[in-house]
Every structure is written in C-alpha cells, then in structure tokens.
C-alpha cells in the first residue's frame, strides 16, 4: 500500500516566516506549539522576541466516507506581537502589521495551492483572519488563522490487512441478527 501524500504545513509556514521581508523586518520568530495552551506558553518567549508566528503541530479533522473519500485536517497558525501595555494605538499598529503579514502569506499560499492540487490535496479557499481579544495577553496583540486541508484517502478494503475474516460474500456472526 502506498501512503497518501500529505502536506507539511509546519515546514511551509516556517519557510514563509524566514523568507518574508516584512516578517524579518518586524523580527517575527517561528515556533511550533501544541494547541492554544502551547501558544500561551510561547507568548512567554516574547521577552526575547518582538513577535512570533506559531503553528499548532496538532490538527483537528475528520474523514468523509463518500464516493471520493477524503480526510480533512485543520491547521492553526497564530501571530503575536508585543506592544506597550494599555497603548491601544500601538496595538492597532501591531494588528495592521499582522494583517499585512497574513496577506503576504496568503499570496504565497495561492501558489502552493496550485502545486498541492496536482497531488490531490485541496486547501479550503475560505481562510479567515481572527483577532484575539485585547485582554488575552497584556501588552501583546494576537491573532490566528486556520487552513483546512483535504487529502484523498484510499479506503479500498484489503483482506491482507485483516485476520480471521469470513469468506467474501458471507457475514460475520457479529453482524447477523434475526429481525422477525
């Protein structure tokens, strides 16, 4: 069985962070986190960094059992930038910067999307940028976006993956009941 091709979102967004001129100018540092709690822990590193791009190395998802079975995974990317506490103008400037970094990331994601579709990987075209409430972390503007990734999933039944199966065309006693 050949494994399904998968997209390495972590490596992709790390590369974007390292290559984007605005992200470099504003000193964004890339990091991997595990969930929102991991992002909160990463915010503690803002003592040594001015801004971060953090990707959640876990993903939410589901599998659809339809004519073209696929698996959907949702990857979350967080942004955070330090600013002076209680300075709403500075917070607004940070949000503007993060929105612009997001826009520039999306300009590269469009190109990546075309490449991925050639490998039967489909990105949801609706990617929302969400600002996190100003009281989430004092002195820090935060936002996130999520990318939904659909990949073809080979669900062909293979006898060699199972043991002690009945012959083809017969039912297992566990699945037969008298419905009279």
Cite the ranges covered by each PLM segment.
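A hydrophobic membrane-anchoring alpha-helix module
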Residues: 146-165
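Small/polar-rich, solvent-exposed N-terminal microdomains that initiate assembly or binding
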Residues: 1-67, 161-180
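Short, solvent-exposed beta-alpha or beta-beta edge segments that form flexible loop/patches at the rim
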Residues: 28-92, 122-141, 155-159
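Acidic-leaning, charged glycine-interspersed low-complexity segments
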Residues: 6, 17, 23, 95-152
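Extracellular/virion structural assembly segments
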Residues: 1-11, 18, 66-72, 78-109
């Amino acid at each position: 069985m050949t494994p399904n091709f998968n997209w390495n979102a972590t490596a992709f967004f790390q590369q974007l962070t390292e290559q984007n001129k605005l992200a470099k100018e504003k000193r964004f540092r890339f990091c991997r986190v595990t969930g929102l709690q991991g992002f909160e822990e990463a915010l503690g590193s803002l003592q040594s960094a001015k801004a971060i791009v953090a990707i959640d190395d876990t993903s939410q998802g589901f599998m659809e059992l339809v004519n073209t079975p696929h698996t959907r995974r949702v990857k979350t990317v967080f942004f955070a930038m330090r600013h002076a506490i209680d300075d709403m103008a500075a917070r607004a400037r940070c949000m503007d910067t993060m929105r612009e970094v997001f826009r520039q990331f999306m300009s590269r994601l469009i190109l990546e999307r075309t490449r991925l579709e050639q490998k039967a990987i489909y990105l949801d075209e609706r990617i929302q940028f969400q600002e996190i409430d100003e009281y989430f972390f004092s002195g820090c503007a935060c936002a996130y976006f999520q990318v939904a990734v659909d990949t073809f999933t080979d669900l062909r039944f293979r006898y060699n993956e199972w043991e002690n199966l009945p012959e083809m065309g017969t039912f297992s006693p566990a699945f037969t009941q008298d419905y009279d």
